[in-house]
Amino acid sequence: NRIRNELLLAAYLFEYPSAAWWESVPACAAAVSEVERPQSRAVFEEFFDYIQESSQGEFEDAYVRAFDFSQNTNLYLTTHNRTDFGKQSEELLRYKQLFLDNGFDLHNELPDYLPALLELASAVSESQALHILTEVQPKLELLRDRLIEAKLPYAFLLDVVLTEAAGLSGRTA
């Protein structure tokens, strides 16, 4: 899978910055050198610079404000633009099926959690990764637009994911 590193880095950066997460920052920052596309590599480098320039408390507070206290920008993709809980349930089942179809099951997370979906796409073949990313693309675009509107740097990470997915399919993002 040509975009495995990019997907894993994006998944990592969207995860809650726990103590284990902070311990992994140096290794993940070093992995940025393996990103092939220069524009994507630059986004990751700048994001890791942002992390290094923030105190741990500041970064964690910003993360919580961005994703835990906002319905507009939370990381559970089926909650965006959803007032029909029946349709939301159907989407959750479709996302769950993406995991099951690829031999994975989630035990501690909902299947619409962005980092989990990115990790799944990184662990499968390119054609399966493209299928997964195409399935969630409208939700990724909506979340990216909301992150841009909220002036959050995480929008650039979704730009990378969407650009890399487009590269797999031969499109331009």
Give, region by region, the residue ranges found by the protein language model.
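Charged, alpha-helix-forming regions
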Residues: 1-112, 119-173
